[in-house]
């Protein structure tokens, strides 16, 4: 929906609160103590009460807004802005649009939303024909490494390793100028190293066993055949990358350009949240106006695990 439709649909705090309650009622409220699925709604307290053990939980409990003191409308506006464009918004721009004074609560809110985006995508595994490769994303140099000489190449302190996976299949009679493959879903996962065991564990978790996998001939991928239907490892010349692994490298290039243009000095420990947002929106690129509704469902279905490293605790914002 465009901005005018959004304002008409959610004009105030009450409209946003009612929408959250509507979504929670549709999905179902589960008691945190006895797992009972039957609840009363206490209008005067604005909370649910379990019919069995009479424990109560707030409207925000178990959602992305859990423990947050920010207005419901902040969350709605942020989710709308994040999903209304192919690109993203910096936290500073979101703070300015919301008219909030402090940066920190808005930054935490946005990363909590990115966290549940990742949780939703982790419900699914990639399948079919798939490309896989690793990439190095530029990140902020850790504080303890800033006084040390900067290494060059892949071992640089300013680079973070990411495993990139893309479902793709060859197209019959591709049109002139088009890619020989078409892409479906992608996943990106920050990894600590390129050891075979590390990559294999990620693939085992994120990829279905029936997958037909295509990679380069790196020794990091030698054990992947144990967890997929077939694995083709090719020696790929640079000029053949767009033919053999096109969508992995298109995704890498697009993500790097987005982060460079919109976000600056991303820390390694937060890179995964930015990748979550990129993959979530890429995987739903044909949803159109429905992407906001889908994100809203995820927002009431998952509580975030995001923790601020600044204070080393989950913050309420």
Language-model features and meaning:
Residues 1-317:
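Residue-level recognition of single "structural anchor" positions
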